[in-house]
Amino acid sequence: MIFIEKYNNKKNIRFPFFKKVIEMSINRNFKTFVETGTSRGKKKFFFFNKMNWKDGMSTLMFAELVSEIRGELHSCDISKKNIDNAKSFTKKFSKNTFFYINDSVDFLTNF
């Protein structure tokens, strides 16, 4: 789980929470992760290859996690633009990461 430390940045104020969630998930052998509201990203963020800490990094962190543990991430957002951005910056984890354009309540009801 060494990968998680690269997300430990002073601007990532949620890092301790994400780290704890990931540790607990690994200890419990969770393989399926469901996210409502994907990381949005910005073109500037991707063009300069800088982390957008204010946008939350959950999609990228969970995508990398499920790639390592051979699990699955299912991420839902109502915005096609947000989904397209998230697909772009998680493409190297696309084998284990799935995106859905949908209202989160509908998505969770039918998941």
Question: For each predicted feature, which ranges?
Answer:
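A short alpha-helical cap/connector motif
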Residues: 1-111
